[in-house]
Amino acid sequence: MKIENYIRDIQGFPKEGILFKDITPLLNNVEARQECLSILVNSLKGQKIDKVVGAESRGFFFGMLLAQELKAGFIPVRKPKKLPFDIISASYELEYGTDSLEMHIDAIKKGDRVLIHDDVLATGGTAKAVCELVEKLGGEIVQCNFLMELTFLNGRKKIKEYPVFAALTY
């Protein structure tokens, strides 16, 4: 089964000039979703994972599935003011300006082996911010793991010190 057949291209979304990669057909197909999960899990080659960190919001879909499959905890990384407990935050650059991500301060313990997951590696800004959060709390990043990588945006350069895996590349 080719999981790329379940990624739909949407021209001009969310704005003109963007070709959006829509993962909802993949999420909606049990066999394609399971195949994708297997590819992501197999990329870890049996490494022990204590926590899976999923970036808001599309990183939550496979992040939770990965955590379940790996028998690991799941940690959501959210946009500002979405988490109810004490947090740490990291900022990252957008095309125009900056944004930040937050994680609960008790989410990771020193020495936890962490898998970071998001749906897309684009510019690498989000992934870099998530890595900073994990390391601030003493976690060891085992891999940054993505459903897709948009290689023309060179996002790997921002997270070059970590192992990176993408199930699909465009």
UniProtKB/Swiss-Prot annotation:
Single GO MF annotation: AMP binding
Annotated EC: 2.4.2.7
Enzyme category, top tier: transferase
UniProt catalytic activity: AMP + diphosphate = 5-phospho-alpha-D-ribose 1-diphosphate + adenine
Keyword Metal-binding belongs to the record: no
Pathway: Purine metabolism; AMP biosynthesis via salvage pathway; AMP from adenine: step 1/1
Source taxon at top rank: Bacteria
Keywords: Cytoplasm, Glycosyltransferase, Purine salvage, Transferase
InterPro entries documented for this protein: Ade_phspho_trans, PRibTrfase_dom, PRTase-like, UPRTase/APRTase
GO biological process, one term: adenine salvage
Pfam families per record: Pribosyltran
GO cellular component term, pick one: cytoplasm
Localization terms from the record: Cytoplasm
UniProt-listed HAMAP family: Aden_phosphoribosyltr
Self-association state and partner proteins as the record states: Homodimer.
Free-text function comment from the UniProt entry: Catalyzes a salvage reaction resulting in the formation of AMP, that is energically less costly than de novo synthesis.
Family as reported in the entry's similarity comment: Belongs to the purine/pyrimidine phosphoribosyltransferase family.
Name assigned to this protein: Adenine phosphoribosyltransferase
Gene that specifies this protein: apt
